[in-house]
Amino acid sequence: MELVLTNAARRIAGPFLRISLAVILAWIGVLKFVDPSPVVGLLQASMPFLAFNAFVYLLGATELVVAFLLITGIALPYAGLVTVGLFAGTLTIFVITPSVTGFPVLSLAGQFLLKDLGLMAAAVNVIAMAPAREPALARPQAVPVEVA
């Protein structure tokens, strides 16, 4: 029974992780277009030079593009890498403005942002699970063998 469960989980783990991450990114990406003010508020407290709507819209568009790549399976290592960057950027708020996050006793904003650590780990797994693509020249070539 354990082997059956493990094998089933292995079959669905990759697609399930990619699609879940895509749904999360799409959702938060769309919300940045609906109301950018919560993100602008966080940026105002942490990185005021980025606290304007156009930057938030750019983040939202990036999240939507990455969500599309994750769902379609296109350029997975790069989609994962950009996702790691998005979540790493969010996590910098803990370092830059601990007063916003309440580190180490987390505020509500800190609790909300902490989930990005798990999402970043999921993005690293997307990179790790992406099929490796070697250039054709790097592949070993078959060597003809003479039969005597």
Where are these regions (language model features)?
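Membrane-interface extramembranous regions
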Residues: M1-A148
